[in-house]
Amino acid sequence: MSTIDRGKVQALIAEERKRFVRDHPKSRRLFERARKSMIGGVPMNWMVEWPGPFPIFAKEARGATITDIEGHRYTDFCLGDTGAMFGHAPPATVAAAARQMRKGITMM
């Protein structure tokens, strides 16, 4: 039976963190800005527990794909909230929302 080399695992994690920071400069800048106006730099408290040094910032999402502001594409295996039901930006839902918004969206 083999054992896990914890030192090697820690070294790999450190290397991945460096790569993440290098590859996400725009997300890092936005996170630093967000920290000035939001607790933990995120819109919801459960988002504070991010696995890396800062979260990615999404530019857009379609179906099960999210694109961050750096242009990296991710497959969204979580599809939280309404994304789980229909994917991100389903055309029929986007069209229905746009039709309604043209009628007014801030009425009391």
Name what the model sees in each region.
Residues 2, 73-108:
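Glycine-rich loop-to-alpha-helix module at the N-terminal edge of alpha/beta enzyme cores
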Residues 26, 58, 66, 85-89:
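Generic, well-ordered alpha-helical segments
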Residues 40, 62, 70, 79, ...:
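Short glycine-rich loop/turn motifs that provide flexible caps or phosphate-binding loops at active sites
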Residues 51-52, 63, 82-83:
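Short active-site-proximal "capping" loops at secondary-structure junctions
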Residues 9-60:
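Active-site-adjacent loop/helix segments that line or gate small-molecule/cofactor pockets in enzymes
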